[in-house]
């Protein structure tokens, strides 16, 4: 029964994400936003505001270099983390500070942070929406990736 409840919450979150963060076609108002982040609170069923997010890019020597930082808005989103020119082919890591978020709500979480590591723009320039569905003891992530752009 607990599995079914968790699955339903996860699926509801995915439906919410698909409705709340539609892809904007290349060349429109959102064309300068090649990387967007969206965070949802699965416990409260709402966007997760003020979640600190760090983005790192993997260097040739295998180390992680600071790339971008931000905090989610009241809508649980961060736009304009980078520009088209800066967001080149490579391996990136998006780190969500989940511990501070849950502690700010008076909860004691299991994870210190959640991260997503992915390869970007390896088969043409794309736009990425990285979404995270958070709870104090679990998290799930998904990505919406546009078709290659010219």
Curated annotation (Swiss-Prot):
L-thyroxine binds at residues 38, 77, 140. GO terms for cellular component: clathrin-coated vesicle; extracellular space; protein-containing complex; yolk. The modification Sulfocysteine is found at residue 33. Coiled coil: none annotated. Sulfonation of the reactive cysteine Cys-33 enhances the stability of the native conformation of TTR, avoiding misassembly of the protein leading to amyloid formation. It is found in: Secreted. The keyword Secreted applies. Detected in serum (at protein level). Detected in liver and choroid plexus. Keywords: Hormone, Secreted, Signal, Sulfation, Thyroid hormone, Transport. GO terms for biological process: oocyte growth; protein tetramerization; protein-containing complex assembly; response to virus; retinol metabolic process; thyroid hormone transport. InterPro entries: Thyroxine_BS, Transthyretin/HIU_hydrolase, Transthyretin/HIU_hydrolase_d, Transthyretin/HIU_hydrolase_sf, Transthyretin_CS. PROSITE patterns: TRANSTHYRETIN_1, TRANSTHYRETIN_2. GO terms for molecular function: hormone activity; hormone binding; protein domain specific binding; protein heterodimerization activity; small molecule binding; thyroid hormone binding. Thyroid hormone-binding protein. Probably transports thyroxine from the bloodstream to the brain. Belongs to the transthyretin family. Homotetramer. Dimer of dimers. In the homotetramer, subunits assemble around a central channel that can accommodate two ligand molecules. This is Transthyretin. It comes from Gallus gallus.
């Amino acid at each position: 029964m607990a599995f079914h409840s968790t699955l339903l919450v996860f699926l509801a979150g995915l439906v919410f994400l698909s409705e709340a963060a539609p892809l904007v076609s290349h060349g429109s108002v959102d064309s300068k936003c090649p990387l967007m982040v969206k965070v949802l609170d699965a416990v409260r069923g709402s966007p997760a505001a003020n979640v600190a997010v760090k983005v790192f890019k993997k260097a040739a020597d295998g180390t992680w270099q600071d790339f971008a930082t931000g905090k989610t808005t009241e809508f649980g989103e961060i736009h304009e983390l980078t520009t088209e020119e800066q967001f080149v082919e490579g391996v990136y890591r998006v780190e969500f500070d989940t511990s501070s978020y849950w502690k700010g709500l008076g909860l004691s979480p299991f994870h210190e942070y959640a991260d997503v590591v992915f390869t970007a723009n390896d088969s043409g320039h794309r736009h990425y929406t990285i979404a995270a569905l958070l709870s104090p003891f679990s998290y799930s992530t998904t990505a919406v990736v546009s078709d290659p752009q010219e």
